[in-house]
């Protein structure tokens, strides 16, 4: 799965017309307009998040304004929103309510974030991904660890994060016990 995504990014020179800020905005709009995951839109959302990862990796290596747009559009907030939504649906399912959307979207979001973290080269981009507690919230999310695939993708994400830790990035994971994170304690 990872190889297919990376090959698609490397082949981006052939399909460069697809790698535009307008396309990134279009994909973000799809995610922003989607309020809930259903069986009818799940596959489209999975593909949308996969394409966002492709664009972000290509942008990091070829056009830094992609990351600026990613930040301005608050795309990472949508990652958190859908992961938390899936966790709530799973909790509802445990209480006898029907599950919606399944783990496909959760897997794609975990994979997308892992791939982005693995391939982001600009330190400022990495700082943004680790700041604002988005990654912390994803780490703390109530994933379905009974699903071996979810557990494997989660572990992969944790390994990827650990490989990016250094004295400058580890500060984003400190918790001072008073709700302050990220080295912002005064």
Protein language model features and the residues they cover:
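Elongated alpha-helical scaffolds that mediate protein-protein interactions in large eukaryotic proteins
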Residues: 1-186
């Amino acid at each position: 799965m990872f190889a297919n995504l990376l090959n698609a990014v490397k082949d981006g020179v052939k399909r460069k017309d697809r790698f535009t800020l307008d396309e990134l905005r279009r994909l973000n709009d799809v995610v922003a307009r989607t309020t809930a995951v259903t069986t009818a839109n799940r596959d489209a959302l999975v593909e949308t998040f996969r394409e966002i990862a492709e664009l972000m990796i290509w942008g990091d290596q070829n056009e830094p304004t992609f990351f600026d747009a990613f930040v301005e559009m608050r795309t990472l907030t949508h990652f958190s929103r859908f992961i938390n939504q899936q966790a709530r649906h799973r909790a509802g399912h445990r209480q006898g309510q029907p599950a919606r959307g399944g783990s496909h979207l959760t897997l794609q979001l975990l994979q997308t974030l892992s791939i982005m973290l693995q391939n982001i080269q600009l330190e400022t981009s990495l700082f943004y991904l680790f700041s604002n507690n988005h990654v912390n919230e994803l780490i703390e999310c109530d994933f379905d660890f009974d699903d071996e695939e979810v557990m494997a993708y989660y572990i992969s994400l944790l390994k990827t994060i650990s490989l990016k830790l250094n004295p400058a990035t580890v500060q984003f994971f400190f918790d001072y016990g008073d709700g302050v994170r990220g080295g912002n304690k005064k």
